[in-house]
């Protein structure tokens, strides 16, 4: 199995990136490839999960081991496949997600694409108590899932508004990491204005 890839980041797409290793280009599917955009044409070390099916072999890539570990736990949950796990990781703060699981916060979990109440309950049933042994969660983070779900809803609404204005999925994904990096509590209007300013650069 391929645990990580180290090479030159050659290109980015909407769902994947390509890393050149000794003249061979490895396509790696990521939650949001544009979190790596500042490393384009530079050396990159990316954690990978080698997913083998009867009809395909796919490399999934992650920013760090924590993100990779959470991916492996998510795909162990009944009803969540690799695509569903990636959709969750694309919009989640790991500590906030774990706090939501521990708090049995259905509202937070159903804020992710493709996660209904039944799947949210299954996530809680399968993962509660199993993530805190690996990830340390503070009391403050334990209480923070309400603000996190509000942030997720803000980002989601802002991204849909940008698409309605004619921006492509690729352009929207490019600005999302910059919005999240500031970690500010924004209204939808503020998030849209900030995203438009970034897109205008």
UniProtKB/Swiss-Prot annotation:
Compartment list: Cytoplasm
Alphabetical list of Pfam families matching this protein: HHH_5 (PF14520), RuvA_C (PF07499), RuvA_N (PF01330)
Keyword DNA damage attributed: yes
Database matches in InterPro entries: DNA_helicase_Holl-junc_RuvA_I (IPR013849), Hlx-hairpin-Hlx_DNA-bd_motif (IPR003583), NA-bd_OB-fold (IPR012340), RuvA (IPR000085), RuvA_2-like (IPR010994), RuvA_C (IPR011114), RuvA_C_sf (IPR036267)
Region Flexible linker, annotated ranges: 143-149
Top-rank taxon, per record: Bacteria
GO molecular function annotation: ATP binding; four-way junction DNA binding; four-way junction helicase activity
Biological process terms in GO annotation: DNA recombination; DNA repair
Signal peptide start-end: none
Entry keywords, A to Z: Cytoplasm, DNA damage, DNA recombination, DNA repair, DNA-binding
Similarity comment: Belongs to the RuvA family.
Entry comment, domain topic: Has three domains with a flexible linker between the domains II and III and assumes an 'L' shape. Domain III is highly mobile and contacts RuvB.
Subunit structure: Homotetramer. Forms an RuvA(8)-RuvB(12)-Holliday junction (HJ) complex. HJ DNA is sandwiched between 2 RuvA tetramers; dsDNA enters through RuvA and exits via RuvB. An RuvB hexamer assembles on each DNA strand where it exits the tetramer. Each RuvB hexamer is contacted by two RuvA subunits (via domain III) on 2 adjacent RuvB subunits; this complex drives branch migration. In the full resolvosome a probable DNA-RuvA(4)-RuvB(12)-RuvC(2) complex forms which resolves the HJ.
Function of the molecule: The RuvA-RuvB-RuvC complex processes Holliday junction (HJ) DNA during genetic recombination and DNA repair, while the RuvA-RuvB complex plays an important role in the rescue of blocked DNA replication forks via replication fork reversal (RFR). RuvA specifically binds to HJ cruciform DNA, conferring on it an open structure. The RuvB hexamer acts as an ATP-dependent pump, pulling dsDNA into and through the RuvAB complex. HJ branch migration allows RuvC to scan DNA until it finds its consensus sequence, where it cleaves and resolves the cruciform DNA.
UniProt name for this protein: Holliday junction branch migration complex subunit RuvA
Taxonomic lineage of the native organism: Bacteria, Bacillati, Bacillota, Bacilli, Bacillales
């Amino acid at each position: 199995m391929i645990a990580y890839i180290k090479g030159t980041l050659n290109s980015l797409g909407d769902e994947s990136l390509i890393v050149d290793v000794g003249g061979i280009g490895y396509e790696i599917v990521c939650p949001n490839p544009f979190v790596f955009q500042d490393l384009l044409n530079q050396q990159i070390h990316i954690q990978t999960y080698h997913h083998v099916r009867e009809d395909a072999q796919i490399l999934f890539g992650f920013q760090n081991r924590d993100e990779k570990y959470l991916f492996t736990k998510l795909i162990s949950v009944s009803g969540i496949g690799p695509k569903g796990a990636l959709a969750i990781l694309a919009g989640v703060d790991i500590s906030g997600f774990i706090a939501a699981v521990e708090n049995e916060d259905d509202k937070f979990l159903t804020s992710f694409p493709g996660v209904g109440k039944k799947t949210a309950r299954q996530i809680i049933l399968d993962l509660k108590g199993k993530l805190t042994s690996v990830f340390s969660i503070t009391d403050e983070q334990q209480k923070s899932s309400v603000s996190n779900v509000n942030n997720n809803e803000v980002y989601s609404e802002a991204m849909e508004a940008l698409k309605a204005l004619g921006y492509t999925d690729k352009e929207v994904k490019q600005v999302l990491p910059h919005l999240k990096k500031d970690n500010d509590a924004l209204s939808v209007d503020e998030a849209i204005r900030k995203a438009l300013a970034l897109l205008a650069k």
